[in-house]
């Protein structure tokens, strides 16, 4: 997972 990964923002 990248350092800016957020489970609330999945593209």
Curated annotation (Swiss-Prot):
GO terms for cellular component: extracellular region. Expressed by the skin glands. It comes from the Eukaryota. Its main location: secreted. The modification Sulfotyrosine is found at residue 11. Keywords: Amphibian defense peptide, G-protein coupled receptor impairing toxin, Secreted, Sulfation, Toxin, Vasoactive, Vasodilator. One of its GO terms (biological process) is defense response. The keyword Secreted applies. It is found in: Secreted. The keyword Secreted applies. One of its GO terms (molecular function) is toxin activity. May produce in vitro relaxation of rat arterial smooth muscle and constriction of intestinal smooth muscle. May target bradykinin receptors (BDKRB). Belongs to the bradykinin-related peptide family. This is Phyllokinin. The lineage of its organism: Eukaryota, Metazoa, Chordata, Craniata, Vertebrata.
């Amino acid at each position: 997972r990248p350092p800016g990964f957020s489970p609330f923002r999945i593209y």
